């Protein structure tokens, strides 16, 4: 008969390996976010690092404040998309441990 503690340790090790792999997948994923109907686009990775900002040339320089708002909105859209991706990827992982959906892990 297998030792229950050894079994628990094996499960914890498998969880840690799967968790690490999932974190790496999330970090490598690129998200495209936008605002203003596509006037401002931001590409960011799963670590919430902005990789590229694209501004439609139709935005004139006089619209500086509008542009600032659109960039902030596109960035926030990207952050929400990364959070959703992380939640979706982690749901299966945490569910296997009996952790309730929506429970935010501190990492």
Curated annotation (Swiss-Prot):
It comes from the Bacteria. Its main location: cytoplasm. GO terms for cellular component: bacterial nucleoid; cytosol. The keyword Cell wall biogenesis/degradation does not apply. It holds the Pfam family YbaB_DNA_bd. Keywords: Cytoplasm, DNA-binding. It is found in: Cytoplasm, Nucleoid. GO terms for molecular function: DNA binding. Binds to DNA and alters its conformation. May be involved in regulation of gene expression, nucleoid organization and DNA protection. Belongs to the YbaB/EbfC family. HAMAP family: DNA_YbaB_EbfC (MF_00274). Homodimer. NCBIfam families: DNA_YbaB_EbfC. This is Nucleoid-associated protein MCA1327.
């Amino acid at each position: 008969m297998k030792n229950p503690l050894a079994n628990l340790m094996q499960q914890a090790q498998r969880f840690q390996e799967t968790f690490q792999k999932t974190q790496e997948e999330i970090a490598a994923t690129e998200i495209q976010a936008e605002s203003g109907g596509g006037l401002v686009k931001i590409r960011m990775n799963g670590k919430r690092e902005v990789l590229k900002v694209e501004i439609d040339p139709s935005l004139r320089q006089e619209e500086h404040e509008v542009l600032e708002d659109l960039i902030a909105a596109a960035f926030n859209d990207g952050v929400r998309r990364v959070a959703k991706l992380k939640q979706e990827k982690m749901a299966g992982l945490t569910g296997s441990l009996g952790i309730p959906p929506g429970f935010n892990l501190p990492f």
